[in-house]
């Protein structure tokens, strides 16, 4: 699924608040997963969206991870400014208390 010589990977980790919007952490994690998976097919160059939940309960773990692949840095930029992605970010501002991201090229 690699296009040309570039494949961009965008990985984001979140730690979630115990509750937000009247929902518990697990409910908000599931809602986040649904919102992120719904981005598939909406952005040209977005190849893959995968969302997982941590089961380790390590003290340094995050509850939710997004793994996504893009055909180019430009495709990642289109994703970042897509209106649906902007809505997710706004929603997340109340749900998460920590975010870590890594973008890299292979």
Residue ranges of predicted features:
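Short S/T/G/P-rich N-terminal loop/turn motif that feeds into the first structured element of a domain
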Residues: 1-62, 71-78, 104-106
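Glycine-rich, flexible loop/turn motifs
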Residues: 51, 88, 100
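C-terminal structural segments of small proteins and small subunits
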Residues: 70-95
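Charge-dense polyanion-binding interfaces
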Residues: 93-106
């Amino acid at each position: 699924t690699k296009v040309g010589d570039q494949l961009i990977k965008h990985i984001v980790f979140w730690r979630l608040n115990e509750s937000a919007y009247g929902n518990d952490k697990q409910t908000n994690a599931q809602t986040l997963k649904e919102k992120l998976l719904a981005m598939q097919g909406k952005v040209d160059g977005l190849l893959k969206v995968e969302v997982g939940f941590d089961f380790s309960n390590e003290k340094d773990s995050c509850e939710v991870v997004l793994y996504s692949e893009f055909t180019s840095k430009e495709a990642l930029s289109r994703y970042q400014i897509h209106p649906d992605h902007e809505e997710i970010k706004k929603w997340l501002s109340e749900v998460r208390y920590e975010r870590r991201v890594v973008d890299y090229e292979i």
